[in-house]
């Protein structure tokens, strides 16, 4: 492979090769490859981002060997995504991509912190990020259960709770958003999103993705007059396997401690298994203060290291 590496903005002509590139990266560190062309389009054309300024493609010998892009996440954070092909490590590509992202982030939001995510299995990432001034701030694990381990027992709901699907009750969309805000208030890393942002991120940006938006899999716990809990599920179907994912689960504070969280998890498992999932996963912050880890383990899930979130603060002179 040539030592000459060109870095240029991403374009729509890169969609298919970028898809193949990212699948090669995730296959090494996760054992799966499920990026789709729609995922790449969503990355390049994320709302508010300019591919000519906010994406970087590293090319050597006509092949993509690195990719990075960044976007504003609220007024105080810029998120970065950067990957180097497993066979192109050790050539400084990752450092160049991160430097370009940092420079662009400083132009975009000079006072904002920068965050990025790395897979725990990527042993080379920590040294690179620390050299670039990043520090680890949060660790996540992926909880997993095989479909064969899901309990056959019917879900037992707390008194007065009815489970409904968003697809059957679209009129509850606003109530779901209100419950989501209440359930995640104060949680680390949660930005207060407007209702429009909530739906853009979870519905519109999912069109054509490996884990598409399916309102039939959005399960709501309904008490008289309000949504008090929710479990937003997704299903990825491929030739290799079908993976169910609990993307978000929450219970409003006033309803915690009564078994509603366990009922939602159990019901989601049964629902995803019934849709053909061979295994079910969800990601959880190891510092979660709502006893989430214990809840998922009590439901039969097994934890394994997943990813780390890194942060870089702007230079002090920028703040003055």
Model regions: which residues?
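Conserved hydrophobic/aromatic pocket- or pore-lining residues that grip, position, or stack substrates
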Residues: 176, 221, 268
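Active-site/acyl-donor-binding loops of N-acyltransferases
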Residues: 131-151, 217, 266, 275-320
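Hydrophobic adenine-recognition pocket in adenosine-nucleotide-binding enzymes
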Residues: 10, 84, 249-251
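Conserved donor-binding loop and adjoining core beta-sheet/short helix segment
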Residues: 22-119, 223, 228-242
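Short amphipathic alpha-helix that is part of the acyltransferase structural core
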Residues: 1-43, 155-197
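Acyl-donor-binding surface of acyltransferase catalytic domains
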Residues: 72-79, 84-162, 167-168, 308-312
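Phosphate-binding active sites in nucleotide-utilizing proteins
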Residues: 183-242, 246-249, 253, 262
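Conserved acetyl-CoA-binding loop-helix of GNAT-fold acetyltransferases
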Residues: 90-104, 248-251, 257-274, 279, ...
């Amino acid at each position: 492979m040539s030592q000459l590496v060109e870095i240029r903005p991403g374009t729509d002509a890169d969609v298919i090769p970028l898809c193949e590139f990212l699948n090669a990266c995730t296959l090494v560190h996760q054992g799966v490859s499920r990026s789709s062309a729609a995922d790449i389009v969503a990355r390049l054309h994320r709302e508010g981002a300019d591919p000519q300024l906010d994406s970087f493609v590293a090319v050597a010998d006509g092949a993509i060997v690195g990719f990075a892009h960044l976007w504003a996440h609220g007024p105080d954070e810029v998120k970065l995504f950067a990957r180097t092909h497993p066979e192109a490590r050790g050539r400084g590509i990752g450092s160049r991509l991160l430097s370009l992202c940092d420079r662009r982030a400083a132009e975009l939001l000079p006072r904002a912190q920068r965050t990025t995510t790395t897979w725990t299995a990527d042993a080379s990432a920590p040294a690179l990020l620390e050299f670039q001034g990043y520090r680890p701030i949060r660790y996540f694990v992926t909880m997993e259960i095989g479909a064969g381990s899901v309990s056959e027992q019917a879900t037992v709901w707390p008194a007065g709770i009815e489970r409904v699907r968003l697809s059957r009750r679209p009129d509850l969309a606003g109530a779901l958003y209100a419950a989501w805000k209440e359930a995640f208030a104060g949680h680390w890393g949660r930005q207060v999103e407007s209702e429009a942002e909530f739906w853009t991120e979870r519905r519109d940006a999912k069109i054509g993705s490996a884990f598409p938006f399916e309102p039939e899999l959005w399960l709501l716990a309904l008490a008289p007059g309000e949504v008090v809990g929710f479990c937003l599920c997704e299903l990825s179907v491929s030739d290799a396997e079908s993976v169910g994912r609990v993307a978000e689960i929450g219970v409003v504070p006033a309803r915690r401690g009564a078994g509603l969280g366990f009922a939602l998890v159990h019901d989601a498992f049964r629902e995803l298994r019934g849709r053909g999932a061979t295994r079910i996963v969800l990601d959880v912050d190891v510092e979660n203060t709502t006893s989430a880890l214990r809840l998922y383990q009590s439901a039969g899930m097994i934890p394994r290291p997943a990813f780390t979130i890194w942060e870089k603060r702007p230079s002090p002179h920028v703040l003055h």
